[in-house]
Each structure stands twice: as structure tokens, then as C-alpha cells.
Amino acid sequence: MFMTMKQNFYHLGIACAVAILVVYRINGLAFLLTLAATIALNDASSHYILKEGITRLRPCHVLPDLEMIIRCSNSFSFPSNHASNTFAAATLMSLCFRNTTFLAIAFALLVCYSRVYLKVHYPSDILGGAIYGSLIGYLCYRHIYTRILKFIKP
């Protein structure tokens, strides 16, 4: 449950952002700006276009006797935004900083596992979110990160 609650990551996120800026400097700044755009684009399109268009019910709505660990969300199930956002971020980070690939993907997989464990998503919701997020992460790397680097690097 720890892995699925956003408020558990605020301080860690700030610490990671500062560390990225200190270690990677200009590339770190370009990454953080691109990450903000990536998550905004991915989260909005995944929710408002895919979820609202596909309208797949969550397991807790289809199986009412399912014993829930956390409250069942009222939003639709496919794709998982947690999976989509973490894979978008992991893909972007892996492309920007090759030495972070294992850690980034491991974190994304852990978040994805938590969504199935908590019974709020089907495995196919996770797979769809991971694929979509990876695609968005790659496209943002190719079209946003590289342009930001050209703009801010002397």
C-alpha cells in the first residue's frame, strides 16, 4: 500500500529532484522540465482519452464480493494511470541517464505490482498502461528533452 499512495513520495521526489540537479546539472534541468511535461501529457491523455473512451470497470465493480485492501475508485480501470505515469517517467529517465535504467524500471514494476495486489486493476490494465507510458516517455524524450537541451546548453 505504501507504493501506491502519492503522499508517501513528496519528500523523496523533492530529494531526487535536487540530487538530479546537483549530479547532472544542465541535463538534470532538461530532464526535470521534460518529466513535468511528460507526466502532464501522459496523465491527462491516459485518463481523459483512454480511460473515458474505453470505460472498463475495475475489478471491485465487477466482483462486488472482492475483499478490498483500499477504497475502490470510481474511475475506470483501463489503462492504469499509475503504470502509465511510472513507465513514462522510467522510460524518460532511462533514455536521459543510461545508468539509471535498472532502478527506474524496478521502481515502475513495483508500483505496477502494487496495483494488482491491491485489486484495483487487472494485469491487462497494467500492461496497457506500461506500454502507453513507455511510448509517451520515448516520444517526450525525442521531441521535448532534445529541444530543451539545445535551448539551454551553450
Tell me the role of every PLM-derived stretch.
Residues L41, S45-L50, I136-I144:
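Alpha-helical membrane-inserting segments
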Residues F2-F9, R25-I26, T86, C96-N99:
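Membrane-interface junctions
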Residues A17-A44:
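Interfacial segments of alpha-helical transmembrane regions
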Residues G13-V23, T86-T91:
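Hydrophobic, aromatic-rich transmembrane alpha-helices
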Residues H11, A30, T34, N99-A106:
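Alpha-helical transmembrane segments of integral membrane proteins
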Residues M1-A15, S46-S75, I152-P154:
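N-terminal transmembrane-helix/juxtamembrane module of multi-pass inner/ER membrane proteins
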Residues E67-P154:
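Membrane-embedded catalytic cores of phosphoryl/pyrophosphoryl-handling enzymes
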